[in-house]
Swiss-Prot record:
Biased segments, Gly residues type: 324-333, 789-798
Organism: Mammut americanum (American mastodon)
Residue numbers spanned by region Triple-helical region: 18-1031
Protein name in UniProt: Collagen alpha-1(I) chain
Subcellular location, record wording: Secreted, Extracellular space, Extracellular matrix
Domain Collagen-like: from-to ranges: 18-76, 75-134, 135-193, 195-252, 522-579, 555-613, 618-676, 678-736, 804-861, 918-976, 972-1030
Allysine PTM sites in chain numbering: 9, 1047
Record text on subunit structure and interactions: Trimers of one alpha 2(I) and two alpha 1(I) chains.
Location of the region described as Nonhelical region (C-terminal) in the Swiss-Prot/TrEMBL record: 1032-1055
Pfam families per the UniProt record, alphabetical: Collagen
Amino acid sequence: QLSYGYDEKSAGGISVPGPMGPSGPRGLPGPPGAPGPQGFQGPPGEPGEPGASGPMGPRGPPGPPGKNGDDGEAGKPGRPGERGPPGPQGARGLPGTAGLPGMKGHRGFSGLDGAKGDAGPAGPKGEPGSPGENGAPGQMGPRGLPGERGRPGAPGPAGARGNDGATGAAGPPGPTGPAGPPGFPGAVGAKGEAGPQGARGSEGPQGVRGEPGPPGPAGAAGPAGNPGADGQPGAKGANGAPGIAGAPGFPGARGPAGPQGPSGAPGPKGNSGEPGAPGSKGDAGAKGEPGPIGIQGPPGPAGEEGKRGARGEPGPTGLPGPPGERGGPGSRGFPGADGVAGPKGPAGERGSPGPAGPKGSPGEAGRPGEAGLPGAKGLTGSPGSPGPDGKTGPPGPAGQDGRPGPPGPPGARGQAGVMGFPGPKGAAGEPGKAGERGVPGPPGAVGAAGKDGEAGAQGPPGPAGPAGERGEQGPAGSPGFQGLPGPAGPPGEAGKPGEQGVPGDLGAPGPSGARGERGFPGERGVQGPPGPAGPRGSNGAPGNDGAKGDAGAPGAPGSQGAPGLQGMPGERGAAGLPGPKGDRGDAGPKGADGSPGKDGPRGLTGPIGPPGPAGAPGDKGEAGPSGPAGPTGARGAPGDRGEPGPPGPAGFAGPPGADGQPGAKGEPGDAGAKGDAGPPGPAGPTGAPGPIGNVGAPGAKGARGSAGPPGATGFPGAAGRVGPPGPSGNAGPPGPPGPAGKEGGKGPRGETGPAGRPGEVGPPGPPGPAGEKGSPGADGPAGAPGTPGPQGIGGQRGVVGLPGQRGERGFPGLPGPSGEPGKQGPSGSSGERGPPGPAGPPGLAGPPGESGREGAPGAEGSPGRDGSPGPKGDRGETGPSGPPGAPGAPGAPGPVGPAGKSGDRGETGPAGPAGPAGPAGVRGPAGPQGPRGDKGETGEQGDRGLKGHRGFSGLQGPPGPPGSPGEQGPSGASGPAGPRGPPGSAGAPGKDGLNGLPGPPGPPGPRGRTGDAGPVGPPGPPGPPGPPGPPSGAFDFSFLPQPPQEKAHDGGRYYRA
């Protein structure tokens, strides 16, 4: 051994003696051989008995409280990240009491799109609440039974079956081996290898069947022929028309959760999606006092997740896992009863706290469910006697605990020690008393808050004692005591709740990165002494989740104490049976929409219904609020704005107003705000948590995969019980956002699913590119308004699939590509703005030509008024919304996002030159004002039409004979009455007699200039109409009520008058 440098003891390997040769004569000692290559390390010996816990390192001073981050702008809600695989399950709580089922709120009707309000200012972002200490994971209540599956909508008609593909040509049969001699006479010759099968020859006469001879030996089987090539697949039959989606089944009652599957290794934590718009932050419940730090018992069965109950008091503080991203708040399940804590193992070293996960974006604040009844608080078991320790194998000599090194900058989390072999899991004992606290080492310096410092260097391990020989594996030692958690940094101040902004569109969630596998647990750091438990606050009523403030900087991690040996894990206690899942309470009222967040990327829209033909766009009505968005994927950037018809809401569009006679051209309404993508549909029920598997080593953070296509949303199941949150894995990098899907009709706001463990929010994909704003075309003369096309049928709301059970959080699929951003849901296609009719007499401005966008502008009556707006540049054509995909099942409809912003209003093209105003034709009646199309931007005022002639004021008729003058007042100096006949000499003013008869009227004086028209006196008899100006061809509808318009000079006004 020595010559090979292999020390069996230290290597722990097993030397395998070779057979001894006979001893030769003793030679003289040769020169010492060079040391041989180092032997490989033998397999690790059985773990020795756990050494005594090393002295506990001092509790690091609490890091400075994280500052509240500035309120961020409300991010667009990220697309909900795909749910990462559930982290390892925390201890399962005893089943919480199921809350009473809330009544299901009605799905509100989608209102017609209201006019888009201006976006309110984004509410201030609430200060981020400081992350509370992570309570020990409550034990998860039993999973409720899976809800019944909603009835599937009626199946659409089956698509035609595709033709079967042609059968591939059969390959030539392999040669058959020679047949054994046939038993019958007329020996059939051995069958030659079959060539490609020739035409079948005519069958020879059958020989007489001889008596069967003894069977000949079977010929060798010929090689198998090649399989024929597969035929081309037949053409796929046409898809049948999508069936009408059945009404979404009601979410069935939640079925019992299946056993919890092993937790997948946590994937890397996905990047956090952009923060959603902050919901209004409800009042924060009082912060419960942290319960005493129990030893973390084996995970109890997962409690059912009820509605979000009041915030349970924090369970004993477990070691802080890396903070997961904050998922959208689900309803908080009833707090499970506290599971019985298992015996406390010796304290492991405290691992350095993982880095805080990126802050997840808060989903839109769910309507707070009615608070479920708080589950009864599980009894905290009296500390039971520790379950029997498994037999400990013969202890290897305990390595000496290294003295804790001075806390270095917290180091990276050390490699996980080799995980001891788990002993059989003892039944979960009642929580043993906490182990004595190790003597605290000197306090580590307070690290700066913020990133997890690197774990301090671990003091040098004492020399390892020689490894004991590998004992039989003893039963696992009792689990080390869980180190006391380091003090939590003081919580950052809770952010004030921002007003709830209107949630921006959900960003497309990036795909959550794959959750890395969980590394072997590092040795548990010595826990710092638990902070004193604060008094347990009563549960506050659950507020709406406020916007999640930015996470405060993480306090500095305490220094990592020297690792105690990790005890073997005790047996896992049996999971409690899942209690029934309470019905999901009604969704609470939706918080007020705050100001709209910025438009996030458009969520994926549900499939767009096929656009109806657009009617001629009336004036654009104000956009109504968008219908609830289906869970929108990332909302694609608004596609090029097609010519807007009246924009139908995407999805179920409100019916476009009929185009009336073209009203006057309205100002374009603002486009409605883009609806935010609805909140993610309720999470499907979480699959039953399997037993917690050992955590694998953390995998590398997966690359962000490309997003998969968004799956159809299943029917929302009842929300599955959320398994206890495992530590959040690191979020994977966000996948690239897929293109935004088409915006489907917004589904009704789904009930807020229970908050899952917050999944890692995938990073939002970048919003799809905004469609280009078409440049405004010139306004053509308005054509006659096209008839409004029928409103496109909103795609049917796909059936909301039942949410499948919440599988383990798989690695988040890459977010599917968001569908391409649908172009803005189809406004029905606006009919092309009919070609501008010939400009009639400048009465109406013909409906503006193609700017199909604007409804036909009402008649712009008199000429010159806005020239007909040129066609608004094409809003890029609304691309064909692809044929509406089969409506995917819309995800559970998200809440109605704020109305999406309208795409940019195309600029109104320059108004075409107004035709010369003729005398205004008679103003045709103004058509009823069509719905106000978007007002394209007002086209440039066309050239004023020529001012029609002011019709001639009719010739002034000869002045009528003057009425008899009233009595003359005392005569002032009478002005010359036109030249009156020469005044007689004014006698002394007589009484006011009648004036002498007026002399015959003098010839009319020259026509004074027409004074401003005073009030029109009673019209004299109209003079003969002046000659009409040149016809403008438009009809004058000016006598109809018109919206005020900037009027061009109405040349016909005088004429009319």
